[in-house]
Amino acid sequence: MNIQLFLSDRIRHALIMAGAPDDSDAQLHPSTKAQFGDYQANGVMSAAKKQRIPPRELAERVLEHLDLSDIAKKVEIAGPGFINIFLNEQWISQKIESVFIGPKLGLTPVTPQRIVIDYSAPNVAKEMHVGHLRSTIIGDAMARTLSFLGHHVIRANHIGDWGTQFGMLIAYLEKIQHDHALEMVLSDLEHFYREAKKHYDEDEIFAQRARDYVVKLQSGDPYCREMWRKLVDITMTQNHLSYERLKVTLTPEDMMGESLYNDMLPNIVEDLIAKGVAVKDQGSVLVFLEEYQNKIGEPMGVVIQKKDGGYLYATTDIACVKYRCETLKADRILYYIDSRQNQHLAQVWTITRLAGYVPESVSLEHHMFGMMLGKDGKPFKTRTGGTVKLSDLLDEAVERAGQLIRGKNPDLNETDLNNLIQAVAIGAVKYADLSKNRTTDYIFDWDRMLSFEGNTAPYIQYAYSRVTSLFKKSGLDEKKIMSPVIIQEEKERSLAILLLQFEEMISTVARDGTPHLMCSYLYDLATRFSIFYEHCPILNAKNEQIRQSRLKLAWLTAKTLKLGLKNLGIETVERM
């Protein structure tokens, strides 16, 4: 049950009954202090301002129409017109029971949507680097979360598998007479790409040969297509090893690269011209958008075809959106691309709406993110100033986690120890990113992310292992816990309410693409359980009924932590 949504609806109805405008909002949120109740509604303030009456007067009218007797033990007006709601302990216990016995922690079923999530998107012939980390793990966390809720999620790995670089690479491989393309690895390709780029910039004959190969590739030349496919396969084979290490759910079947839309591009341009959306201008084809103006106030032109007949990223992205709506039947499309692409995407979406490719009912959302920075506040680099490869970053995470964990677990066998190290290392890297608001830059700090204190993956993983250890000592499993939850202590009450707020939290994350809120929730839950554990004896409770009640709260805490971390793509461990 989404308590926040339930209470908001009731308060909004009472506001309207009290004479407030029909568009009034309860502005309900969990209270930050116990003296203000469990939830506080602030919507009276803005509604009263519109009506030009004292907020407290409107609040009193609202309470006359607000019946929460089935859920709250007390509803009071505080300050100038805030409404504080104190939940009833018996109602809390009943809802905890529903969560305990219900599938998916008793979540309300959603109306399923077809949701396309565009994330990761590495380039061919280059190793993945730290710049790919945020898109990959934030996008995957959202894919997991939305799938868990019951939506049909289509993962789209929009790899850069087309363009001039392939002509350059094919020309260079021919130049050095490289006959062993199947034996190449990605590091070879990176070296070849750098050399090919150098020749392309310095040797006009080579550059023309590369351009000729691009034309041949686009026209379906068998040799060029075979070489192109090998280059893509070599790259993505290596990238999928990184996905496996990161516990990312992308598969080869999710690959929807730029090349997928090639055959659509000529028709897209013709159609946009025919509809009057695009115009020919000095040999090029452009779309002029009134919404975007240049420095002198003229509509900005988005080029979709160059004078030489070539297409641009905008053309491909227009075709991509069209494909996702018409072929994939998307209801919602989420893009996990960095903030620098915001205007580009906005222009593409405006064009697709003008052309009628995207119905108004389809939501197009850019869930942009900031950069990963070093401790110096500059983009994260190697000590020599180079780009940090993703594989090197993960290797270092494992090494650092191993140094922390090996000494603390001397009796673990090597297999279990390595599994623990991997879970902590990869979890720490992912959580450090996911726990930050994606719209901001963040500082990458090894010491902080691997700490067993504070808002980190190791802290939450440890909290989970602590509960599983408790159950082993109890000799019970959850199926044998028959007693209902009895709330007598404030620490029990506080933990129970937070457990009930899981649904409103995961709903917010799914709506806004904000996994950092789930991280904050899990950290709060782990912390609140620790306080509960210290103040409320569990195994040594004063009677069996209280013992089972508290074990039930502990079991729900463990299940919620495990489920929350799983939706973030982070493993739990039974022992730390």
Curated annotation (Swiss-Prot):
SMART domains: Arg_tRNA_synt_N, DALR_1. GO terms for molecular function: arginine-tRNA ligase activity; ATP binding. It is found in: Cytoplasm. Keywords: Aminoacyl-tRNA synthetase, ATP-binding, Cytoplasm, Ligase, Nucleotide-binding, Protein biosynthesis. Its main location: cytoplasm. SUPFAM superfamilies: Anticodon-binding domain of a subclass of class I aminoacyl-tRNA synthetases, Arginyl-tRNA synthetase (ArgRS), N-terminal 'additional' domain, Nucleotidylyl transferase. It catalyses: tRNA(Arg) + L-arginine + ATP = L-arginyl-tRNA(Arg) + AMP + diphosphate. Pfam families: Arg_tRNA_synt_N (PF03485), DALR_1 (PF05746), tRNA-synt_1d (PF00750). GO terms for cellular component: cytoplasm. One of its GO terms (biological process) is arginyl-tRNA aminoacylation. Its EC number is 6.1.1.19. A motif ('HIGH' region) lies at residues 122-132. The keyword Coiled coil does not apply. The keyword Protein biosynthesis applies. PROSITE patterns: AA_TRNA_LIGASE_I. Belongs to the class-I aminoacyl-tRNA synthetase family. This is Arginine--tRNA ligase. It comes from Hamiltonella defensa subsp. Acyrthosiphon pisum (strain 5AT).
